[in-house]
Regions:
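Structural signature of the two symmetry-related core transmembrane helices
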Residues: 64-79
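Helix-to-loop junctions at the C-terminal end of transmembrane segments
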Residues: 50-61, 147
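A late C-terminal transmembrane helix in Major Facilitator Superfamily
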Residues: 113-149
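Intracellular juxtamembrane helix-capping segments at the cytosolic ends
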Residues: 103-116
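Hydrophobic core of transmembrane alpha-helices in multi-pass small-molecule transporters
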Residues: 89-103
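Multi-pass alpha-helical transporter architecture, strongest
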Residues: 161-188
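A membrane-interface helix-boundary motif in multi-pass transporters
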Residues: 147-162
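Extracytoplasmic gate region of multi-pass secondary transporters
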Residues: 1-50
Length: 194
């Protein structure tokens, strides 16, 4: 459930921002070309974020790494909202938020694959991916409601940080709960053989 919630929230943020970020930036007084360039920075850093989080997941507990990724995503998404004084600063904040967010989101299938037992792994990951798509749909539509509500740029990005923070909390809950669940007999036997 926590993996599905996290993936849902991640796609909600991603599709809302990739669909509506140019219009939101235009509302701050930027030209359409400036808004398009800044928007392109959001997914651009994803490759960097994936490499960094992937390497960290191999060295540190993957749940904690991805949870921190979501926590930092929330912080930097919020900071985007308060960077309207400078388009260059906004571009940097969007790039960092996109790098971390895309890294955390792209790490989710690997995290899920490590969580589910072998016989149910494909089903578990598929459910997470499928439920996450509904977050993407909701994200694309949510932008219209936020624009219609005429909320400030700062307010919109502060609200957008909430799903990222919820994702971090969900992964920490998943980590705590899965740590307290005893291994099944088959898992215990395989650990004893190793």
């Amino acid at each position: 459930v926590m993996l599905c919630l996290t993936y849902f929230m991640g796609l909600l943020i991603f599709y809302l921002l990739t669909s509506w970020l140019p219009l939101l930036i235009r509302e701050t007084g930027a030209s359409m070309s400036q808004a398009s360039i800044i928007t392109a920075l959001f997914p651009l850093g994803g490759g960097i974020g994936v490499l960094i989080l992937g390497a960290l997941m191999d060295k540190i507990n993957p749940n904690k790494v991805v949870a921190v990724g979501w926590l930092l995503t929330g912080v930097f998404v919020c900071l985007v909202g308060f960077s309207t004084s400078s388009l260059a600063l906004m571009g940097v904040m969007v790039f960092i938020a996109g790098s971390i967010m895309n890294g955390a989101q792209s790490s989710m299938p690997a995290l899920a694959a490590g969580f589910y037992p072998t016989q149910g792994r494909a089903t578990g990951v598929a459910w997470m991916l499928g439920i996450g798509r509904f977050g993407g749909i909701l994200g694309a539509f949510s932008g219209a409601f936020l624009m219609q509500a005429q909320l400030s740029f700062e307010t919109i990005f502060t609200l957008l940080a909430i799903p990222a923070f919820l994702s971090a909390i969900a992964l920490l809950i998943k980590y705590r709960v899965s740590k307290s669940v005893p291994a099944t007999t088959d898992e215990a036997r395989s650990l004893q053989k190793a």
